[in-house]
Swiss-Prot record:
This is Growth hormone receptor. Its main location: membrane. The lineage of its organism: Eukaryota, Metazoa, Chordata, Craniata, Vertebrata. Residues 289-638 are cytoplasmic. Residues 19-264 are extracellular. One of its GO terms (biological process) is growth hormone receptor signaling pathway. The WSXWS motif appears to be necessary for proper protein folding and thereby efficient intracellular transport and cell-surface receptor binding. The box 1 motif is required for JAK interaction and/or activation. Keywords: Cell membrane, Disulfide bond, Endocytosis, Glycoprotein, Membrane, Phosphoprotein, Receptor, Secreted, Signal, Transmembrane, Transmembrane helix, Ubl conjugation. Receptor for pituitary gland growth hormone (GH1) involved in regulating postnatal body growth. On ligand binding, couples to the JAK2/STAT5 pathway. On growth hormone (GH) binding, forms homodimers and binds JAK2 via a box 1-containing domain. It comes from the Eukaryota. Residues 1-18 form the signal peptide. Disulfide bonds join C56-C66, C101-C112, C126-C140.
Length: 638
């Protein structure tokens, strides 16, 4: 191969000389010399025609040899005209005497051989070539730098194992170190490099250098033939020696199916097409279920909807139609608290005690021009027009102590004014006759009945005597009402829908006389409340038994209507008052409770107020009883 490259270079040089003449000849020769040096580094020529060193080599670190070239005019020179001289440094100084090569024959033509007698390690050498007495080339080195071991010998291989498929096998290659290298004694340490390839291949596969003389080779195909070679180098050196002879490895075919391994299953193509198919299917699913996937990932924002109302009305701004629809449905109606006196929210203006002593709200709000009806604590006004019945349970009894229902009697406006005047007159008489009133029996406490308005009203009566006594105390003791405000009227409605109560009318201490002298006195017991729309049979019997059998006609007494099924409170009051005296029985003074908290919310239109904690007398619980009909009352009445 080297000869053919040399001939090709010469042919190119000849063709270039033919075109460019004699001027191109030196340049062509230089290029040819460079090409030869690249092809074979050992072949070095001197363009000037002078000899030059090619290499110096020590195979075992005991001897070494150097080689050189003759030059271009080699044939014109006589043999022995080129000589080699060397010099070495002993200890710290170089010797001044140049010595000639000891052996020109042992290493071959154009070489000089230094045996062990002339070789010293760790000592620098300098050599030079002379021709006809003149120096043509010079080089300096040490022996350990030029070590290139001989190739290993005795290569062989052994089979380690065969794969389960019978296609691949593992072998181990062994060799012997170079015979002239004293490896056993450790004078030199060698590293080995193994290379292998299939027959008819050009690229060798190199394995990592090892210090041992055996290397395993894995995954060799049984139906192939391989070439193996080994070379060595001194440890920590970069120059390898010559390759060993090539070892041919032929593995027998152990399995009849080994040839099928040539046909490899196209896993790579299957994976590629599989991924492509899955991608296409995924895109098809996404496009086919686009809306559903969009709703799952990004759910739509719900449109505000009201049941029974078209959303287009809200978009177009037709608020009048929307309000009309809302007014039709009961669920959308707003509760107008201003129409009803019974509310769930009450706001009270609590004044300081100093302000209360200076003057109460009643003194500031009430005057002669604004007369309002006095509200008895036992009865609450209700302008809603709806009836209500409150039956609070007492001590887990089956029936309430007092059944409270709405009354149906209607009293004319003049009668209401006269009743208010009678109450004022009664308060004045209680002040004048306070010493004599103390002797009055408790069983003869009067019960004042007053119809406040023409509207039907709910009557809320507690089952204890404290509530009744409180009502009488508020009427009979004007001094206790000096700084007490009765919140019974609505003065304002807040934006939140709550109402603010204002004080009602109270008795004035300056009134000493009254225009109307009608006094209604009931001889019934204290625990019998005449304000009830209905009453028990036992209480009616007690009341009738205590009343004198004298019938006095009064212009305020309404007659019983025979068509009524039940007896009203007004009828019973009138009948009982015909035989009563004109004097009002006094009652003991007690603190008046201030109803400022809500006890029970009966309905959106009604509530029950709680009284503040007051010392209460012993409670007398009434047994439950039924209602008295008209026929039964006629039989009882005298």
């Amino acid at each position: 191969m080297d000869l053919w490259q040399l001939l090709l270079t010469l042919a190119v040089a000849g063709s270039s000389d033919a075109f460019s003449g004699s001027e191109a000849t030196p340049a062509v020769l230089v290029r040819a010399s460079q090409s030869l040096q690249r092809v074979h580094p050992g072949l070095e020529t001197n363009s000037s025609g002078k000899p030059k060193f090619t290499k110096c080599r020590s195979p075992e670190l005991e001897t070494f040899s150097c080689h050189w070239t003759d030059g271009v005019r080699h044939g014109l020179q006589s043999p022995g005209s080129i000589q080699l001289f060397y010099i070495r440094r002993s200890t710290q100084e170089w010797t001044q005497e140049w010595k000639e090569c000891p052996d020109y024959v042992s290493a071959g033509e154009n070489s000089c051989y230094f045996n062990s007698s002339y070789t010293s390690i760790w000592i620098p050498y300098c050599i030079k070539l002379t021709s006809n007495g003149g120096t043509v080339d010079q080089k300096c080195f040490s022996v350990e730098e030029i070590v290139q071991p001989d190739p290993p010998i005795g290569l062989n291989w052994t089979l380690l194992n065969i794969s389960l498929t019978g296609i691949h096998a593992d072998i181990q290659v062994r060799w012997e170190p170079p015979p002239n290298a004293d490896v056993q004694k450790g004078w030199i340490v060698l590293e080995y490099e193994l290379q292998y390839k299939e027959v008819n291949e050009t690229q060798w596969k190199m394995m990592d250098p090892v210090l041992s003389t055996s290397v395993p080779v894995y995954s060799l195909r049984l139906d192939k033939e391989y070439e193996v070679r080994v070379r060595s180098r001194q440890r920590n050196s970069e120059k390898y020696g010559e390759f060993s002879e090539v070892l041919y490895v032929t593995l027998p075919q152990m399995s009849p199916f080994a040839c099928e391994e040539d046909f490899r299953f196209p896993w790579f193509l299957i994976i590629i097409f599989g991924i492509f198919g899955l991608t296409v299917i995924l895109f098809l699913l996404i496009f086919s279920k686009q809306q559903r996937i969009k709703m799952l990932i990004l759910p739509p924002v719900p449109v505000p909807k009201i049941k029974g109302i078209d959303p287009d009305l809200l978009k177009e701004g037709k608020l009048e139609e929307v309000n009309t629809i809302l007014a039709i449905h009961d669920n959308y109606k707003h509760e107008f608290y201003s129409d009803d006196s019974w509310v769930e929210f009450i706001e009270l203006d609590i004044d300081d005690p100093d302000e209360k002593t200076e003057g109460s709200d009643t003194d500031r709000l009430l005057n002669n021009d604004h007369e309002k009806s006095l509200t008895i604590l036992g009865a609450k006004e209700d302008d809603s027009g709806r009836t209500s019945c409150y039956e609070p349970d007492i001590l887990e009894t089956d029936f309430n102590a007092n059944d409270v229902c709405d009354g149906t009697a209607e009293v004319a406006q003049p009668q209401r004014l006269k009743g208010e005047a009678d109450l004022l007159c009664l308060d004045q008489k209680n002040q004048n006759n306070s010493p004599s009133n103390d002797a009055a029996p408790a069983t003869q406490q009067p019960s004042v009945i007053l119809a406040e308005e023409n509207k039907p009203r709910p009557l809320i009566i507690s089952g204890t005597d404290s509530t009744h006594q409180t009502a009488h105390t508020q009427l009979s003791n004007p001094s206790s009402l000096a700084n007490i405000d009765f919140y019974a009227q609505v003065s304002d409605i807040t934006p939140a829908g709550s109402v603010v109560l204002s004080p009602g009318q109270k008795n004035k201490a300056g009134i000493s006389q009254c225009d109307m002298h009608l006094e209604v006195v009931s001889p019934c017991p204290a625990n019998f409340i005449m304000d009830n729309a209905y009453f028990c049979e036992a209480d009616a019997k007690k009341c009738i038994a205590m009343a004198p059998h004298v019938e006095v006609e009064s212009r305020l007494a309404p007659s019983f209507n025979q068509e009524d099924i039940y007896i009203t409170t007004e009828s019973l009051t009138t009948t009982a008052g015909r035989s009563a005296t004109a004097e009002c029985a006094p009652s003991s003074e007690m603190p008046v409770p201030d109803y400022t908290s809500i006890h029970i919310v009966q309905s959106p239109q009604g509530l029950v107020l709680n009284a503040t904690a007051l010392p209460l007398p012993d409670k007398e619980f009434l047994s439950s009883c039924g209602y008295v009909s008209t026929d039964q009352l006629n039989k009882i009445m005298p």
